[in-house]
């Protein structure tokens, strides 16, 4: 009987977490991480990779909302924004992309038409201009704290990785880190798309991330399941294995 009770107690938090997940369409699902933070997964076709699930985040404070990354297109982004409005009773006012790729800024055009303010690494802004993509309005170089009606969203550029311009966003009131595509999930075994990566800098960037956010409760990667700080070291192992395999004569 005692064994059964312990097993039920261990499973109960998982059941509670599962109850906080919702599928709002065939290609978008949302999971609540805390009272104010949600992570979403959008499924879309990415050239050369097939159907890919991509993560982003929704942060809520006093009926205002911030999106960290968008789905890959305007249609999915509109669906997500409408869900935030209708289900969370919040207006999306703020957008912060992880880097310049489509699975981060694909819906920026729609957000701009809605008057949403966007904040990005200046490198992301420059790359978006160069490639003829929608361009975020407000840039920073090393770090920027964006206030969501008093709730700090701390943006940091700590170096190149999956992309030369990738950042992380820290939510200090929630102890949640959005690492984006710089980080791999625990099930990942491949380095993935490195067409725009700075592979040499990547391990050093990860060391900075690990040192800066040792207390993160949740760490959310760009693709795959969220976890804890172990994702940082796991990603470093994958990158180092790739570097070693490609440096052999």
From Swiss-Prot:
It catalyses: a beta-lactam + H2O = a substituted beta-amino acid. Its main location: periplasm. Competitively inhibited by 4-morpholineethanesulfonic acid (MES), SB236050 and biphenyl tetrazoles (BPTs). Also inhibited by chelating agents such as EDTA and 1,10-phenanthroline. CcrA is not susceptible to inactivation by the beta-lactamase-blocking agents clavulanic acid or tazobactam. Keywords: Antibiotic resistance, Hydrolase, Metal-binding, Periplasm, Signal, Zinc. It is an enzyme of class 3 (hydrolase). Changing residue 181 to S: The overall structure of the mutant is the same as that of the wild-type, however the site of the second zinc ion is unoccupied. Zn(2+) 2 binds at residues 103, 181, 223. GO terms for biological process: antibiotic catabolic process; response to antibiotic. It is found in: Periplasm. Its EC number is 3.5.2.6. Residues 1-18 form the signal peptide. GO terms for cellular component: periplasmic space. The keyword Signal applies. Binds 2 Zn(2+) ions per subunit. It can also bind Cd(2+) and Co(2+) to a lesser extent. One of its GO terms (molecular function) is zinc ion binding. InterPro entries: Beta-lactamase_class-B_CS, Metallo-B-lactamas, NDM-1-like, RibonucZ/Hydroxyglut_hydro. Monomer. Confers resistance to the different beta-lactams antibiotics (penicillin, cephalosporin and carbapenem) via the hydrolysis of the beta-lactam ring. PANTHER family: ACYL-COENZYME A THIOESTERASE MBLAC2, METALLO-BETA-LACTAMASE DOMAIN-CONTAINING. This is Metallo-beta-lactamase type 2. The gene is ccrA.
